[in-house]
A protein has these predicted regions:
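Short linear Ser/Thr-Pro motifs
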Residues: 75, 109-110, 123, 193, ...
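Conserved AdoMet/S-adenosylmethionine-binding subsite of the radical SAM
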Residues: 145-154, 159-317
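Conserved alpha-helical substructure of the radical SAM core
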Residues: 124-154
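Canonical Radical SAM [4Fe-4S] cluster-binding loop centered on the CxxxCxxC motif
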Residues: 99-136
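Phospho-regulated, low-complexity intrinsically disordered regions of nuclear gene-regulatory
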Residues: 86, 98-99
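A short loop-to-beta-strand scaffold at the N-terminal edge of the catalytic core in hydrolase folds
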Residues: 92-97
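Auxiliary Fe-S-binding modules of radical SAM enzymes
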Residues: 1-91, 245-253, 259-345
Length: 345
């Protein structure tokens, strides 16, 4: 039996081609695309300006992907909501909805699990199950929009998974997300986080998208980075910085370096000096992250005073730096924690 095509992963031109092959006029594709990506309906049956016969034909030919909420947690501290969504094959992924003064932000997953093995991340503990499709990534956002009744203005691909390990689907997702015929979210309001698969980053640079690239650095020497991130066994920091220069040259977009502060591991004065030396030649921003403790690892978070002192040292040397605001700490807010607890139940 042939696998049905995933209709929500098609762009408008691809959808036109599909529907024309069924004998429909091009305007039908525009109508259907609006139902899927603007009105965010959950089934063909809700597309009321399409004939019942045509809707039945679509059901037979196409898969209509929707994620289903199985658990929702809300922070009593800041109103952050964490969603655990079930996929059509029974796998689960997590997403986070956060409220800021500038608007609502959603953090989505790009894979079921992760194979990158970063030592301070819960989402990698059980390895990689599979990649998410463009529609499964989109519907995390669509489902949260439906459930909260509020518009999403910013999207962060920083949940479970390594986006560059799912490159083709991520690229398709980004184009669908920012399409003027769909949600029309500005590329500048989209952030993609990566541990740094360098050939893929070069490819992404050549796309010249205006998204924000957030690169997980977390250490200032290859020796330290290898202890925290297995990807550092493949690519050196020198190679990483060269690709960052290329990315900026191609896109004109400042890189964000994510730097998780682990007590006694990468938060010393020497680490600060080395980070300054790495950052100065680049157009970049440093985002300091108080590491989230997970029970399977013995890493501890740097204390607040230490984090502030680290930040001050960078600022005094002209480095653009912030400390990430901790959201949802009372609801398994760290990446992968809610999914892991659900699977262990």
């Amino acid at each position: 039996m042939d696998t049905k095509k995933d209709i929500k992963s098609l762009n408008l031109e691809e959808l036109k081609t599909e529907l024309e092959s069924m004998g429909e006029k091009a305007f039908r594709a525009k109508q259907m695309y609006e139902w899927m990506h603007v009105k965010l309906v959950r089934s063909f049956d809700e597309m009321t300006n399409l004939s019942a016969k045509f809707r039945e034909q679509c059901k037979e030919k196409y898969e209509y992907t929707c994620v289903n909420p199985v658990r929702i947690q809300e922070s009593k501290i800041d109103g952050t909501k964490k969603f655990l969504f079930e996929l059509s094959d029974g796998n689960v992924v997590e997403s986070v909805w956060m409220q800021y003064k500038h608007g609502n932000s959603v953090c989505i997953s790009s894979q079921v699990g992760c194979r990158m093995g970063c030592k301070f991340c819960a989402s990698t503990l059980d390895g990689l199950e599979r990649n998410l499709t463009p529609s499964e990534m989109l519907d995390q956002i669509y489902a949260i929009t439906r459930l909260t009744g509020e518009r999403v203005s910013n999207v962060v691909v920083m949940g479970t998974g390594e986006p560059m390990d799912n490159y083709n689907n991520i690229l398709k997702f980004l184009h669908l997300l920012t399409d003027e015929n769909g949600l029309n979210i500005s590329q500048r309001n989209v952030t993609v986080s990566t541990c740094g698969i360098l050939p893929r980053l070069r490819q992404l640079a050549d796309e010249k998208l205006q998204i924000t690239l957030a690169l997980s650095l977390h250490a200032t020497t290859d020796e330290k980075r290898r202890k925290l991130m297995p990807i550092a066994n493949r690519y050196s920091i020198k190679e990483l910085m060269e690709v960052c220069q290329y990315y900026f040259k191609q896109t004109g977009r400042r890189i964000t370096f994510e730097y998780s502060l682990v007590g006694g591991v990468n938060d010393t004065e020497e680490d600060a000096r080395e980070l300054i030396a790495l950052a100065k030649p680049l157009c970049c921003h440093i985002n300091l992250i108080p590491v989230n403790p997970i029970k399977e690892r013995d890493y501890v978070q740097s204390d607040t005073k230490h984090i502030q002192a680290f930040k001050n040292k960078l600022e005094k040397n002209g480095i653009n730096v912030t400390i990430r605001r901790e959201m949802g700490r009372d609801i398994d807010g760290a990446c992968g924690q809610l999914r892991k607890k659900f699977l262990e139940r």
